């Protein structure tokens, strides 16, 4: 396992992560190097060396799967590259522009025998091919199979070039609220007196005109759901009372509510 000292608190941001492994180096510091958004991080390794099965034909390779268990990371991926046989640093995958790290088209001419590049721009599922979510665009045709994913979650418009405003799971409500679909979907508990709520993350404009829509997928007979823009100096109490600048209620599943502000 390789870890860094960095903490990842901004759930609305995309991160560009580059891992360089060079087994010929003697120290872990030189053998394992990680850059996050163009900056090299301090790393710590524990347990079995990660290179034991990496890129080996006879081994099953999983994307975002936890090493012990059957769970997977609950994140979006925009571009994933594995270069077999070369130890490349972050400059091959991004660059600084105006002080901001920007991912670029990888400067890689040959991905090696078992290398691959996933752009995640297809919606096909199942056995890997050039038309599925696991399509390899490196030219090596190392397509990955997929399972446990819906077509609606593939090739999402939310991307580093078009970063969506999302709900913020760090803003805790009265009741436990599971977030999914890249923090675009929440499910309330439905218990009496419990309020499910969240603020929109920092990618939402703080000035000017703002508009967003919310779709209700399912609603219990006794449930009452509404959506609003709440002033930063207001609090929601445990019964769900709020002070707002705009509010819309849902009567049944299938309702669509639009909320906006008219500030210039």
Where are these regions (language model features)?
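Secreted extracellular polysaccharide-interacting domains
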Residues: 1-5, 176-205
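Extracellular glycan-interaction patches encoded by glycine-rich segments
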Residues: 54-77
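Secretory/extracellular carbohydrate-interaction modules
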Residues: 189-255
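Extended recognition patches within non-cytosolic domains
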Residues: 26-28, 40-46, 77-140, 147-160
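Short hydrophobic/aromatic patches on beta-strands that form ligand-binding or substrate-lining surfaces
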Residues: 17-19, 63, 77-81, 118-119, ...
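Extracellular glycan-interaction surfaces
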Residues: 1-50, 259-264
């Amino acid at each position: 396992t390789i870890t860094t000292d960095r903490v990842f608190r901004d759930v609305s941001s995309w991160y560009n992560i580059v891992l360089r492994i060079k087994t010929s180096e003697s120290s872990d510091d030189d053998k394992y190097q990680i850059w996050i958004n163009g900056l090299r991080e301090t790393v710590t390794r524990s347990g079995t060396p990660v290179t034991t099965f990496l890129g080996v034909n006879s081994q099953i390779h999983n994307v975002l799967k936890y090493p012990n268990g059957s769970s997977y990371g609950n994140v979006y991926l925009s571009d994933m590259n594995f270069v077999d046989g070369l130890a490349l640093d972050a400059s091959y995958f991004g660059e600084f522009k105006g002080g901001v790290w920007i991912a670029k088209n990888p400067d890689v001419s040959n991905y090696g025998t078992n290398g691959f590049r996933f752009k995640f721009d297809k919606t096909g599922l199942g056995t890997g091919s050039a038309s599925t979510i696991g399509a390899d665009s490196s030219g090596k045709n190392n397509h990955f199979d997929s399972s446990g994913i819906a077509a609606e979650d593939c090739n999402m418009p939310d991307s580093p070039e078009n970063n969506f405003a999302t709900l913020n799971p760090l803003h805790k409500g009265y009741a436990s609220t599971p977030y999914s679909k890249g923090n675009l979907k929440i499910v309330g508990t439905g218990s009496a007196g419990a309020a499910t709520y969240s603020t929109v993350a920092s990618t939402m404009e703080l000035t000017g005109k703002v508009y967003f829509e919310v779709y209700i997928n399912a609603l219990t007979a006794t449930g009452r759901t509404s959506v609003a823009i709440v002033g930063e100096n207001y609090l929601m109490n445990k019964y769900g009372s709020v002070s707002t600048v705009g509010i819309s209620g849902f009567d049944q599943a299938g309702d669509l509510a639009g909320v906006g502000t008219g500030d210039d």
